[in-house]
Amino acid sequence: MPNDRESGPSGLSPRELERYKRQLILPGWGLAAQARLREAVVFVAGAGGLGSPVTQYLAAAGVGTLRVCDSGVVELSNLNRQLLHADRDVSHPKVRSANRTLRRVNPHVRIVPLEAVIDDHSVEALVGDAGLIVDCLDNFPTRLVLNAFAVRRSLPMIHAGVTGYCGQITFLHPPATACLACIVPEAPPPEVFPILGATAGLLGCLEALEALKFLAGGGTLLTGRLLFCDGSTMQFQEVAIEKDPRCPVCGRR
């Protein structure tokens, strides 16, 4: 991080104030909201098609610490949608190129690259002191592990998923809302699915927007609502989702 901390009461340096000035004039934003972003710690699960736009926009907006977790290596077939990575990164860990790219996006942000598998044993240490989880994963078994941890710790989690031209997104914060297991009780069988880079970009940007609204304290979140996006027809549909009292993960909370 650059050492230019001649800051005012907000804790933001002159360079940071200049960097963020266009969002600082948003109605209801201001220095207080920007300072909240600067103090925030966000856990981003996945540095791929969704994680690329999520982490870049959170870094650009000035979120203080991003814990970016991915166990995979960059493959050539990733590069149509995973803009954190480039040709030179093929066969190397995704978190390595993610760390390099995000530091270029905003040197004021702390990046914690975590090359690890998320499972029942590792999830607590990986999430660490994050106050928000952003699900940018591409497999449901790991999503459900992350969801169960979020429920136990009462942590908010933003979920999104994409396939082809389509995607979905919601904001989960049990016990006030349903959890992911209320919506998808069991992991569907694994498959290789088609995906267009722009679809992942769209849903990732929506996840970043939800995260920034939550952290800054403005706007209406997608709590209790699942937003479906069909890029092939440009139709957006919202459905209400309710907590399942019989859910084995959150039903008794």
Across the structure, where does each feature detected by a protein language model lie?
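Adenine nucleotide-associated cytosolic modules
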Residues: M1-R253
